[in-house]
Design a protein with these regions (language model features):
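Surface-exposed repetitive/solenoidal architectures
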Residues: 1-334
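C-terminal outer-membrane/trafficking sorting elements
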Residues: 332-372
Length: 372
């Protein structure tokens, strides 16, 4: 079949300079779209930015579409069913087709959100998603870096039941891959597997977000899929990366899936935050899934895989789960000791949370971080 050009795609489009993005409203009214074929997957203009829409611009709205399993989407990078690149709003869309990126970033709904803007809400993915790196049920990831001054990315009320995997073992997650922004009330029931491939560093595997950066806020999310990877993996978040000094909060989330690793930083909620510059907190979260690792006897926990992750109030470890090395021994799971500025860690002093990171000391009120 002939490859159908994506709507809003320019042959010279780049992620940093997007031309001719769709800026109107497309209402599918619940109708089903079938027969879309994208099979060009080389590192060229034909192999990039392929989906139903190549790019949705800031004012663009695409909604009420069912993307059937009788579509074929295989492309080089930023691959999705509804959109390759999204700066606008995708709402109430469902995908049943399998999505494949031969290189970077595949999502069941959209490939990547860019330029600090983009919303995906009330969308559902049922297809399997694969990529070389970063395969996710809803969105492959979002653009970050010095050029982005405000992060207004949002994924809300979305579900994934497709299976996720990468060919080099890096970055699979149920909802989003490399991501900066907010994720609220999302659910993953698909199985996540990053154990295959040839990459030396197989990591960043999770039920909701594989790799978070720049003040991610994850609230009210649930994972019930099995999580299989090597290191930096969690039932909710795999790894929190270096970003700004704003706080990253994971709250009111539940993991019911088994989490199985082969190396360091394996946990039921958040695997690792060693490279984060701001406070990473876990509050009112529950882990009911068994957590195991064949390669570590130290950096493994039912809630966290690293002591740099602060455990707030209301966290619950499911009845019958084995006690792991990084499980809390007090209600907050925060050490009540004197501060040693030469060592990183999270402490409780005079009723306040204190985090020492990169030889800097911070006190935290709520989610606000103030350098002393």
């Amino acid at each position: 079949p002939t490859q159908l050009p994506a709507i809003g795609k320019d042959g010279n489009a780049q992620i940093t300079k997007i031309a001719y993005g769709f800026d109107g409203t497309f209402d599918g009214d619940g109708h089903t779209i079938s027969g879309i074929y994208h099979t060009e997957n080389g590192n060229n203009a034909e192999g990039k930015y392929n989906a139903l829409f190549g790019c949705i611009d800031k004012n663009g709205v695409v909604k009420n579409i069912v993307f059937s399993e009788n579509n074929h989407i295989t492309s080089y990078n930023y691959v999705g069913s509804i959109a390759s690149l999204n700066m606008g709003t995708i709402e109430n869309c469902s995908n049943y087709a399998d999505i494949t990126a031969t290189n970077f970033a595949a999502g069941g709904i959209c490939g990547f959100m860019v330029n600090g803007n983009g919303t995906v809400k009330d969308c559902h993915n049922y297809g399997n998603v694969t990529a070389m790196t970063y395969a996710s049920g809803i969105c492959g990831g979002s653009q970050s870096g010095k050029s982005i001054t405000t992060y207004s990315y949002l994924i809300e009320d979305c579900t994934n039941s497709g299976n996720l995997s990468t060919s080099n073992g890096l970055g699979s997650a149920g909802i989003a891959g490399s991501y900066s922004g907010a994720i609220r009330n999302c659910t993953n029931s698909g199985n996540v597997d990053d154990t295959q491939g040839t990459a030396k560093s197989k990591q960043y595997t999770a039920g909701i977000v594989s790799c978070a950066s720049n003040a991610v806020d994850i609230e009210g999310c649930t994972n019930s899929g099995s999580i299989n990877g090597v290191k930096n993996l969690g039932g909710i978040v795999g790894n929190v990366m270096k970003g700004d000094e704003a706080a990253t909060a994971i709250s009111n989330c539940v993991n019911n899936g088994a989490v199985s690793g082969q190396d360091l930083y394996v946990a039921g909620i958040v695997g690792n935050s060693a490279r984060a510059e701001g406070l990473v907190s876990v509050v009112k979260c529950t882990n009911n899934g068994e957590v195991t690792s064949t390669g570590t006897s130290e950096f493994i926990g039912n809630l966290r895989g690293n002591t740099t992750i602060a455990l707030g109030d209301g966290n619950v470890i499911g009845t019958g789960l084995k006690v792991l090395p990084l499980d809390p021994t007090d209600p907050t799971g925060i050490s009540d000791v004197n501060i040693n500025k030469t060592a990183d860690g999270v402490f409780l002093r005079n009723g306040k949370i204190v985090i020492v990171k990169n030889n800097k000391e911070y006190t935290v009120g709520g989610v606000q971080m103030v350098e002393k």
